[in-house]
């Protein structure tokens, strides 16, 4: 039985190695940076919480497309290797790139399950 959800904590540990990383809203105006949103929900059995499952969106913002892509690829690599195993199971479910007002954004979406 799981007592505490740690998906956001682990994601922050992995992504903050590559870029300033924030939950929901950036606390900076300097590029590059990334923000994430997460909607963890417990999945119950008769014994209590079996696991948590979250839809997670990570968006990298930068004025330089190549740098945004490099940061995004590093985050993808770390999430897929660092959040798959006994404690977590992750899969990437989306990847989009956009440019608005000369700022590039690359959004990656994941489904992440936490088992321990």
Annotate each language-model stretch with its function.
Residues 1-48, 66, 73-77, 82, ...:
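Small/polar-rich, solvent-exposed N-terminal microdomains that initiate assembly or binding
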Residues 46-48, 59-63, 81-86, 116:
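Glycine-rich loops and low-complexity Gly/Arg-rich segments
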Residues 50-66, 104-114:
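Oligomerization/assembly interface segments of phage tail-like spikes and tubes
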Residues 77-116:
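Acidic-leaning, charged glycine-interspersed low-complexity segments
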């Amino acid at each position: 039985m799981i007592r505490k959800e740690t998906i956001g904590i682990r994601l922050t540990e992995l992504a903050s190695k590559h870029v300033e990383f924030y939950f929901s809203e950036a606390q900076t105006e300097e590029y590059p940076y990334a923000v994430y949103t997460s909607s963890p929900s417990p999945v119950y059995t008769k014994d209590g919480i079996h696991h948590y499952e979250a839809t997670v969106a990570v968006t990298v913002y930068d004025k330089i497309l190549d740098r945004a892509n490099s940061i995004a690829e590093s985050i993808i690599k770390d999430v897929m290797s660092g959040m798959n195993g006994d404690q977590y199971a992750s899969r990437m479910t989306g990847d989009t790139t956009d440019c608005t007002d000369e700022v590039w954004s690359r959004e990656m979406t994941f489904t992440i399950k936490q088992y321990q």
